[in-house]
């Protein structure tokens, strides 16, 4: 990506050893490893008034720091596409030097909709460039690629209708192509994405026809209920898992290491967790979120690397649920984290050590031009994670209504820097 620092594979516990070697080495200059892992939190943020530029915020995420939980940096989008993008999901490059934010509603102003930031110096990020795939719009989720670059779900076509696409960017942040070559004619509005490169597998989940969320389009919201199973290497769709009545399969995650190549999605309106059989193309309801809170809108999923724990945000319920999925067809509720009425949790992210879960309280408010009004309270929460519990870290207090001089801001995608790099 943008090689300000050279990436190395040294683990955190090796840093003191390297420092010692440098100290005792002879006159030759020595390169030490510096570990930024878990010290910086990036947040894709929109101006609530839609007048000031959208921006990437940097928060001190070092638990040992006196500035823990404070905004310490900010980079505005530059140029003609700076405002009104509705910053949405976030991605971070495999080498930790680039952050990308998606403009969910950029298409409404006919402007660029994917925004790259150089975070080589995490305390002072810089806007790098923007892009506008010609065949698609409504930028949603990002999946970094090990060789550099990203896969990006684009929920709509160029005018925000169906079909959408999956766009690919290479390590130089250049658009490679939009997939598939010939997309499904009906219901292809990809939002969630998950990969297992070791078994050549990708899945995407269809959520909603974006144009139906606008006041200018008559009628109600046209939710989707389907998951696409892809050949990752060829970027082609192998089969579709239909889930009639799901009411919006907003996210999808493959179970890490699962020999049967299964995964999960959730129906936002029917409130069920579905176990997906990607080989047979079937889905089975295995948990009912209405038992936690009816009408709670289960949304984004995160799984631990061992495939034994699942976290899900419940936007309208003001909760985050933690499930034991060690038996994938029989999930068991472990903990409900209560964030309060009108909190509106949506985006969630686990740290690499899986000891902290970050939660942002904002989904989408289309203000005076659309049908979706899920504002939330604009707070960022951190929960301490153990094998069977979630509890709020009371030291971390961050409210985007008051954090910036320009006024209230809407925080959405969050990502923690996990990087060790060489330093002279």
For each feature predicted by the language model, list its residue ranges.
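Blade-loop segments of beta-propeller domains
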Residues: 68-143
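A short beta-strand motif characteristic of beta-propeller blades
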Residues: 71-81, 123-132, 175-183, 236-242, ...
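Loop/turn-rich, solvent-exposed surfaces of beta-rich toroidal or solenoidal domains
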Residues: 294-380
């Amino acid at each position: 990506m943008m090689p300000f620092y050279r990436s190395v594979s040294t683990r955190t516990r090796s840093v003191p050893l390297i420092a010692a070697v440098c100290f005792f080495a002879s006159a030759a200059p020595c390169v030490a490893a510096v570990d930024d892992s878990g010290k910086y939190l990036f947040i894709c943020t929109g101006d609530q008034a839609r007048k000031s530029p959208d921006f990437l915020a940097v928060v001190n995420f070092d638990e040992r720091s006196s500035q823990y939980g404070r905004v310490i940096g900010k980079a505005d989008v530059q140029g003609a596409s700076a405002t009104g993008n509705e910053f949405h999901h976030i991605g971070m490059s495999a080498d930790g030097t680039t952050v990308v934010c998606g403009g969910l509603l950029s298409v409404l102003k006919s402007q660029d909709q994917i925004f790259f930031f150089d975070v080589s110096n995490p305390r002072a990020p810089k806007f790098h460039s923007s892009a506008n795939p010609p065949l698609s719009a409504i930028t949603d989720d990002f999946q970094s690629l090990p060789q550099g670059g990203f896969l990006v779900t684009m929920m709509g076509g160029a005018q925000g209708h169906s079909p959408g696409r999956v766009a690919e960017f290479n390590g130089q942040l250049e658009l490679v192509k939009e997939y598939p070559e010939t997309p499904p004619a009906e219901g292809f509005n990809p939002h969630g994405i998950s990969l297992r490169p070791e078994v050549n597998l990708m899945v995407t989940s269809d959520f909603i026809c974006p144009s139906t969320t606008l006041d200018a389009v008559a009628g109600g919201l046209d939710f989707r209920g389907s998951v696409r199973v892809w050949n990752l290497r060829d970027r082609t769709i192998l089969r579709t898992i239909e889930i009639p009545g799901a009411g919006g399969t907003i996210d999808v995650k493959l179970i890490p290491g699962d020999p049967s190549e299964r995964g999960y999605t959730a129906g936002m309106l029917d409130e069920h967790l579905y176990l997906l059989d990607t080989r047979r193309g079937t889905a089975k309801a295995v948990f009912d979120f209405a038992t936690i809170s009816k009408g709670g809108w289960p949304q984004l999923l995160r799984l631990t690397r061992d495939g034994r724990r699942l976290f899900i945000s419940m936007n309208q319920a003001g909760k985050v649920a933690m499930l034991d999925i060690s038996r994938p067809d029989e999930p068991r509720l472990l903990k409900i984290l209560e964030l309060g009425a009108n909190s509106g949790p949506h985006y969630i992210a686990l740290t690499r050590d899986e000891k902290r879960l970050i939660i942002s309280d904002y989904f989408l408010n289309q203000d005076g031009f659309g049908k979706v009004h899920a504002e939330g309270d604009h707070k960022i929460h951190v929960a301490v994670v153990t094998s069977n519990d979630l509890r709020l870290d009371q030291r971390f207090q961050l409210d985007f209504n008051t954090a910036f001089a320009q006024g209230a801001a809407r925080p959405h995608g969050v990502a923690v820097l996990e990087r060790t790099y060489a330093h002279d």
